[in-house]
Amino acid sequence: MTRFSSLLASALLLLLPVASAGAAAPAALFEAKTVADRDSTLTALEAAPTDPASAYAAGAGQFFTALEILAGGLHRHGFESPQSFILPLMRLPVPDNPNPEPLTYDGFRAILVAFRDRLEKSAATLGSVPADADIGMEVDLTRLGIDLNEDGQIAPDESAAAIMASLSRGGAPDPAGPALTFRFDRADGYWLQGYAEFLMAQADFWLAHDFS
């Protein structure tokens, strides 16, 4: 797997089955099929900030939902995702929208503000995890995803594996293929926090300009 795919895997890290996060977390997050189910468990994890594993998972989930906010906003108004090589994690394969809503200047800014604010929350949550926290989480990238088209569902073609396949070769993963399981630790949390702050700076750049 390419370095880019590995980085994307880190960025799309969903809230994983961790013993201290509670027994309900694996079913609600790792196997979440709807945004409502995932968000319900994310809210519960956010309410347990003193637990390092819960904070780590919540911070990753907040980053994950920031990407979803951006993808949903682009899809709602019929835009393609930015193709800049400088921002690979913003190059989400947003589905075509045959009935896009008109986009106003204020609406464009609102998407950026929501994206930026969610990233800020993610960076702060990840930063709260102690440096010596012993965290090891495993995830199958074929079983997690984000809602790219705002239909409230997390479909197989919206999985991390499908997104990575689309970005790397314009294809789709083999449904009968093996699981794509990765293990993430505290060091990956530092990287994710840094990338959240980098993307925040990009959003701030756009928000600092008046294009009306």
What residue ranges belong to the model's regions?
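Residue-level recognition of tetratricopeptide repeat
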Residues: 51-54
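Short coil/linker segments at helix-helix boundaries
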Residues: 24-42, 63-212
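Alpha-helical structural motif
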Residues: 7-8, 118
